[in-house]
Structure formats: structure tokens, C-alpha cells
Design a protein with these regions (language model features):
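Proline-centered helix-kink/hinge sites
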Residues: 2, 131, 149, 185, ...
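RNA pseudouridine synthases
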Residues: 2-98, 108, 118-121, 164, ...
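Pseudouridine synthase
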Residues: 13-21, 52, 63, 92, ...
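Conserved structural locus in ABC ATPase nucleotide-binding domains
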Residues: 34, 113, 125-127
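Histidine-centered divalent metal-coordination motifs
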Residues: 36, 137-140, 242
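Residue-level signal for inorganic ion chemistry
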Residues: 47, 73, 114, 139, ...
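Short clusters of hydrophobic/aromatic residues that line enzyme substrate/ligand-binding pockets
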Residues: 86, 90, 99-103, 150, ...
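Extended, charge-rich low-complexity interaction segments
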Residues: 103-115
Length: 242
């Protein structure tokens, strides 16, 4: 899914993926179905179900945690420690004309694992993130709570989410659903990945960290889910709590 395309419509959203599903029938007996979502400004892997049965199985796999997702983000600053588990409850609150998610110890449980893959001095870092839970704007709020908001995320990071002197591309949200692993009945696990959008590649070049990134994650070959998840299992050693 490209950044800027909403998955579902709303009172002010008339262009969205849900309204395009008929075009994606591609000769099948029925259009595909949505089984999960990405934020409008998040790019990356989005799975659609071809049949009602597939939709039911996929929905169950997301609820039971049989599926796993890996996100990549560029954040301003560098998290310390370099890997950890963020355990901060979240709640939705009305904002200035739009709803906003805030950290709330009495809110819904929200857990995210992260790892620093590469960094450009102290100004920015590339993170691999796994949402253990799936709350609205979870990764965005959790990264901001670390003091390292996602680049371009003015909603949750304010001015700290931008790098002075950067170009237009660096002012967009730098959050990408890199890979997903889902059960494929009778065939084991299905692994899917999405190439990085141009804006994130361009930002890395501006930060002059592209060589380190390619060496760390094998970008040229488009890394598999295993390399996207490197280190995830050991992340829970450190926790952030409210």
C-alpha cells in the first residue's frame, strides 16, 4: 500500500482502498476482503483475503498472534538502549478537530518491540519494530514516548519529529510495514515483504547511511522476514513502562 491512501473511508475520506476492492477481483468470483489495516500515511504490506473462509482464518491468525509483522521506521534521535520492549497503555482522546492517542496507564495494553539497525550520528536512526499488540497509532505513540518520534510524525512528535534543513520528502511519515508472516493452511507459513518507498530511500541518502543499511540488512536483495526480525526474540530483556 502506498503512503497517502486510506484503507477505509470516513466522513471526509472518499478515496480509499475499501472502495477499490471491486477493481482487484482479477477474475475471481468475488472481490477480496480487508482483514487488517494500515494508517493512511503508512506504506507497506497489506494482506487481502480472496474468500470469506480465508478472511475468517486470517482474522483468527491476527487475533491469536499466529501472524507476525515487521515495520521499519526512521526516527529522530537514537533510542537508548538499542533494543527493548515498550510497554505503555494507550487511550484515545479528542484533540483539536481530530482524535489523538495518548499514553495512559489505565488505557488498553499496548506492547511494541524495537531494535536499532543503523543510525546517522545522533540525529536519526533506522528501527525494526514489531507490534505485539495492535492498537491505533501504537508504534507512532510508542516511538514518541521514547523521545525519538518517527520522522515526519508531527502529530505525535511535534517539532522534534523533523530534521532542520531536510527536504520535502523528509517531512512525510517514515513508517513502512516491511514484512508479514501469516499461516498458509496446509503449506506452512507465507512470508511477504514490501520494497521501501522512494521517500525513505531518499532520506537515507540525505543522512548518508545507505551503505551501512545495505550492509546490515541486505537491502539490494530485499531481505526476507527472518532478517527483518533479527534480534526480536531477545528484545524483551529491557522494558519501558509508564
Amino acid at each position: 500500500k502506498p503512503a497517502g491512501l486510506a484503507v477505509q473511508g470516513g466522513s471526509k475520506t472518499t478515496r480509499h482502498l475499501d472502495g477499490m476492492l471491486d477493481v482487484l477481483t482479477l477474475g475471481a468470483a468475488e472481490p477480496p476482503r480487508l482483514v487488517h489495516r494500515l494508517d493512511k500515511d503508512t506504506s507497506g504490506v497489506l494482506v487481502l483475503a480472496r474468500t470469506a473462509k480465508a478472511a475468517r482464518l486470517l482474522t483468527e491468525s491476527f487475533r491469536s498472534k499466529d501472524s507476525r509483522k515487521a515495520y521499519w521506521a526512521i526516527v529522530t534521535g537514537v533510542p537508548r538502549p538499542a533494543m527493548g520492549r515498550i510497554n505503555l497503555g494507550l487511550d484515545k482522546r479528542p484533540g483539536q478537530g481530530r482524535e489523538k492517542v495518548v499514553v495512559d496507564e489505565d488505557g488498553k495494553a499496548a506492547i511494541s518491540d524495537y531494535r536499532v539497525i543503523e543510525h546517522a550520528g545522533r540525529s536519526a536512526a533506522w528501527l525494526s519494530l514489531e507490534p505485539v499488540t495492535g492498537r491505533t497509532h501504537q508504534l507512532r505513540v510508542h516511538c514518541a514516548a521514547l523521545g525519538t518520534p518517527i520522522l515526519g510524525d508531527g502529530k505525535y512528535g511535534g517539532k522534534a519529529a523533523f530534521i532542520e534543513g531536510s527536504d520535502k520528502a523528509a517531512r512525510r511519515l517514515h513508517l513502512h510495514a516491511r514484512a508479514i508472516r501469516i499461516p498458509n493452511p496446509g503449506r506452512g507459513m507465507l512470508q511477504l515483504s514490501a520494497p521501501l518507498p522512494d521517500q525513505m530511500n531518499k532520506t537515507w541518502k540525505l543522512l548518508r547511511v545507505e551503505e551501512g543499511i545495505a550492509a546490515a540488512a541486505g537491502l539490494e536483495a530485499i531481505p526476507t522476514l527472518e532478517s527483518a526480525y533479527t534480534g526480536i526474540e531477545s528484545i524483551s530483556a529491557v522494558s519501558y513502562t509508564h
